[in-house]
UniProtKB/Swiss-Prot annotation:
One of its GO terms (cellular component) is cytoplasm. The keyword Magnesium does not apply. The active site is at T7 (nucleophile). This is Proteasome subunit beta 2. It comes from Thermococcus sibiricus (strain DSM 12597 / MM 739). GO terms for molecular function: threonine-type endopeptidase activity. The 20S proteasome core is composed of 14 alpha and 14 beta subunits that assemble into four stacked heptameric rings, resulting in a barrel-shaped structure. The two inner rings, each composed of seven catalytic beta subunits, are sandwiched by two outer rings, each composed of seven alpha subunits. The catalytic chamber with the active sites is on the inside of the barrel. Has a gated structure, the ends of the cylinder being occluded by the N-termini of the alpha-subunits. Is capped at one or both ends by the proteasome regulatory ATPase, PAN.
């Protein structure tokens, strides 16, 4: 079987924090391989990354970023900011452009301020208030465009992110809609949850 994969990941930045959401379905051709893949990985207690693409590549990049964050903390005595980590990740991806990591990444965090960025496989870096990646992006971005407000609460952003991923899952066969991983990051820290739907 040819391995065809897809997903939808979403990021929303607010004045009080960042919300990341992703489906948990992995596909093998036209078959659902599992409903329990974590597509959002914490790097520190204040920064996480999502991926659309190769989960193995994401895991390798996450290990690199974790090591760099620990080294930075040890060297400078303070945590690496999400903006600095996004720039570091951009450089790592760009250095590998001839043998690219097969990923589209969203990085979000709150160290000194809320930060959200998306990166393409060659290291292209865009900081934004909201973004999506993956095969369900055309559906998810429409929900974000319609519902995003700069002054919205974390809870409203969480609901919007879940709605965006679920909507994508209803229209994109490679995005799951039954279980959604959500990570919320504020100045108080990070909270991870899994939201499940019966239908």
């Amino acid at each position: 079987m040819e391995k065809k994969t897809g997903t939808t990941t979403v990021g929303i930045k607010l004045k009080d924090g960042v919300v990341l959401a992703a489906d948990t379905q992995a596909s093998l051709d036209h078959m659902v391989e599992t409903l329990n893949i974590k597509k959002i990985l914490p790097i520190t207690d204040r920064i996480a990354i999502t991926t659309a693409g190769s989960v193995g590549d994401l895991q390798a990049l996450a290990r690199m970023l974790e090591a760099e964050a620990k080294y930075y903390q040890f060297t400078w005595g303070k945590p690496m900011t999400a903006k600095a980590m996004a720039n570091l990740l951009s450089n790592i991806l760009n250095e590998s452009k001839w043998f690219p990591y097969m990923v589209q990444i969203i990085i979000g965090g709150y160290v000194e301020e809320p930060t959200l960025a998306s990166l393409d496989p060659l290291g292209g870096l865009i900081f934004d208030n909201y973004t999506t990646t993956g095969s369900g992006s055309p559906f998810a971005i429409a929900i974000l465009e319609d519902g995003y407000k700069e002054d919205m609460s974390i809870e409203d952003a969480r609901e919007l992110a879940i709605k965006a991923v679920r909507t994508a899952g209803k229209r994109d066969v490679y995005t799951g809609e039954r279980k959604i991983q959500v990570i919320t990051i504020t100045k108080e820290g990070m909270k991870e949850e899994f939201v499940e739907f019966k239908e």
